[in-house]
């Protein structure tokens, strides 16, 4: 595996948060906004959930998965989604600094270090594949549910969803 770096110069919602969470290093500008917005659509962030939970911890994830609230870059840094939050004028310099340090490491050592950290996180490749399969089933089931259909229709119609209690 190669090192990955997220350079966040804007907002990230839904799967965009997942992409940030997947990266080894994440740097964002102070004005960036984030939201795990799937619940507003009657869905869940199933596909990205393993990566988001690994980045921000389960308790933060429970809150943000359910509320779908918008949070800003300083909060993203505080909870671990971003490693650094910088003024927009300093983003390129901050990214260059990280790339400088990455460029000093041996590629094999970096790949093994990344693999080691992933293993220490407790998830094997088989675990990840099983979770991906379970999450794919979950999101497929929710997308065709009445709630998922209403959420997506409301999003496309640019209106508030009309939720019905189960």
Feature map (PLM): residue ranges:
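Crotonase-fold acyl-CoA enzyme core
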Residues: 1-110, 145, 159
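Helix-loop "lid/cap" segments that line or gate small-molecule binding pockets
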Residues: 64-65, 116-122, 137-143
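Short beta-strand->loop
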Residues: 124-131
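Short C-terminal tail/terminal secondary-structure segment
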Residues: 160-166
């Amino acid at each position: 595996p190669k090192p990955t770096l997220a350079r966040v110069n804007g907002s990230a919602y839904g799967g965009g948060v997942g992409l940030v969470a997947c990266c080894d290093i994440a740097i964002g500008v102070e004005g960036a906004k984030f939201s795990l917005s799937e619940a507003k659509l009657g869905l869940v962030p199933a596909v990205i959930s393993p990566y988001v939970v690994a980045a921000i911890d389960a308790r933060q994830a429970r809150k943000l998965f359910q509320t779908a609230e918008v949070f800003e870059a300083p909060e993203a840094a505080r909870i671990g989604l971003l490693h650094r939050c910088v003024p927009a004028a300093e983003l390129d310099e901050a990214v260059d600094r990280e790339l400088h340090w990455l460029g000093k490491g041996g590629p094999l050592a970096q790949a093994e270090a990344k693999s080691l950290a992933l293993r220490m996180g407790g998830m094997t490749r088989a675990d990840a594949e099983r979770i991906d399969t379970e999450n794919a089933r979950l999101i497929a089931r929710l997308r065709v549910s009445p709630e998922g259909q209403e959420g997506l229709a409301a999003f496309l119609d640019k209106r508030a969803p009309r939720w019905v209690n189960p």
